Curated annotation (Swiss-Prot):
<dbReference type="GO" id="GO:0005829">
    <property type="term" value="C:cytosol"/>
</dbReference>
<keyword id="KW-0238">DNA-binding</keyword>
<comment type="similarity">
    <text>Belongs to the YbaB/EbfC family.</text>
</comment>
<comment type="function">
    <text>Binds to DNA and alters its conformation. May be involved in regulation of gene expression, nucleoid organization and DNA protection.</text>
</comment>
<keyword id="KW-0963">Cytoplasm</keyword>
<dbReference type="GO" id="GO:0003677">
    <property type="term" value="F:DNA binding"/>
</dbReference>
<dbReference type="InterPro" id="IPR036894">
    <property type="entry name" value="YbaB-like_sf"/>
</dbReference>
<dbReference type="GO" id="GO:0043590">
    <property type="term" value="C:bacterial nucleoid"/>
</dbReference>
<comment type="subunit">
    <text>Homodimer.</text>
</comment>
<protein>
    <recommendedName>
        <fullName>Nucleoid-associated protein LJ_0424</fullName>
    </recommendedName>
</protein>
<dbReference type="InterPro" id="IPR004401">
    <property type="entry name" value="YbaB/EbfC"/>
</dbReference>
<dbReference type="Pfam" id="PF02575">
    <property type="entry name" value="YbaB_DNA_bd"/>
</dbReference>
Length: 109
C-alpha cells in the first residue's frame, strides 16, 4: 500500500478540529450580532436639540427634534442638526460592532 500524501502535518483529525472551531466561532459571531441588534445607540446634536436613536442593526428607531431647533427662517440649520445626530448614531453602532466583532476578524485581513 502506498504512502499517504503529507499535507504539512494537517491530518484529517486536525481538519475536523478546524471545522469544529470555525463552526463554534460562527455561532459566537451570530450570538454577538443578535446581542448588538437588541441594543440602542444614540447620536446627539447641539446639546440634544436633535437626538437620533438606532438599533444595533443600524435601523433608525426614533428621531426627536426639540421645538427650539425648528426655525422656519433657517431650515438648513435643522437639516444640519439631523444629519449630525444621525451620523453620530451610526458611528456609535459601528464602533460597538467593531469592538464586539473585531476579536473575530483580527488576523483575517
Amino acid at each position: 500500500m502506498g504512502k499517504r500524501p503529507n499535507f504539512g502535518g494537517m491530518g484529517m483529525g486536525n481538519m475536523q478540529g478546524l471545522i469544529k472551531q470555525a463552526k463554534k466561532m460562527q455561532q459566537q459571531m451570530e450570538a454577538e450580532q443578535a446581542n448588538l441588534a437588541t441594543q440602542e445607540f444614540v447620536g446627539k446634536a447641539a446639546d440634544d436639540m436633535v437626538v437620533a436613536t438606532f438599533s444595533g442593526d443600524r435601523k433608525l428607531k426614533d428621531l426627536k427634534i426639540n421645538k427650539e431647533a425648528i426655525d422656519p427662517d433657517d431650515p438648513d440649520m435643522l437639516q444640519d442638526l439631523v444629519i449630525d445626530a444621525v451620523n453620530k448614531g451610526i458611528k456609535a453602532v459601528d464602533d460597538a460592532t467593531q469592538a464586539s466583532m473585531g476579536k473575530y476578524t483580527k488576523g483575517l485581513m
